[in-house]
Regions:
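Short, flexible loop motifs at catalytic/binding sites
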Residues: 1-259
Length: 259
């Protein structure tokens, strides 16, 4: 590793956006440089700011986001950056089913494989359930229904994807069994991210409290037009083809339903 690469590595360690400049992702045109949307930059900044000592009370995040806006890519980049530059850390990716969690882990492994060699750490375990680096940091994929795998364990970064789609009883059990361990640590971070899916669910309750500053979660709402091609014409087409309620929930990120 030369001096230039060492300096780049130092900058990447301090700034997740700097790290993201070296990320390549698979697109319809093949492997391409990651070009973040404005909201993706803001989310990466928010997540990483929560790691600072002065932000100890605002480390946890809850995000509502529209379909197919690139939120999974952000989860993958942030989790990978966290693992590479923080030794001896444990990361868990949780979703409503194991296959969904594995898909995110696959994306993380994909990004990892395409990093420049001077940034990419050696992996001691690399399969569809766990990725572990030589710095002793690792990430596992779990389903919400099997959170016994992480119950009582000290997870440094827990990311729950499509949290609103987890079965209500599974999500409630997750909160009761995992959240107390996380909440007792000032250095642990939890990120809940999802498209809304009704109001009779713990995810909605956490969101409602977050926007009223009644819990430790920092709320972020991603708008339907956060993706450049999503304009009024696109909106009208989606409503025409799928209906107003579909658009409001899946893209305008409204919580629709009744108790």
């Amino acid at each position: 590793m030369n001096i230039k690469e060492i300096n780049i590595l130092k900058k990447c360690a301090k700034n997740v956006l700097q790290f993201s400049r070296f990320v390549k992702i698979l697109t319809n045109h093949g492997l391409d440089d990651f070009r973040p949307y404005s909201f993706q930059k803001k989310l990466l900044d928010k997540f990483s700011d929560g790691l600072k000592p002065e932000s100890a009370g605002r480390r946890n995040h809850i995000v509502i986001a529209p379909r197919q806006c690139g939120k999974t890519t952000i989860i993958a980049i942030y989790a990978l950056w966290y693992m590479i530059f923080n030794p001896d850390k444990s990361v868990a990716i949780m979703s409503y089913k194991l296959d969904a969690a594995k898909e995110i882990l696959y994306k993380i492994r994909e990004i990892y494989c395409n990093l420049p060699e001077f940034i990419k750490p050696a992996a001691t375990i690399n399969n569809n359930k766990i990725l572990k680096f030589e710095n002793n940091s690792y990430i596992i994929a779990v389903a919400c229904s099997s959170n016994a795998m992480i119950k009582g364990r000290s997870i440094d970064l827990l990311i729950a994807d499509e949290a609103a789609f987890m079965r209500k009883s599974d999500f409630d059990n997750f909160l009761m069994s995992v959240f107390p361990t996380q909440a007792s640590r000032r250095d642990a971070q939890m990120i809940l991210i999802s498209t809304p899916h009704g109001i009779d669910h713990g995810f909605y309750e956490i969101w409602k409290k977050a926007i009223n500053s009644e819990n430790s979660f920092v709320p972020s709402k991603i708008r339907w037009n956060c993706v450049p091609y999503r304009n009024e014409e696109w909106k009208e087409r989606i409503i025409r083809e799928c209906g107003d309620i579909f658009f409001r929930q899946e893209y305008a990120v409204e919580f629709i339903g009744s108790k």
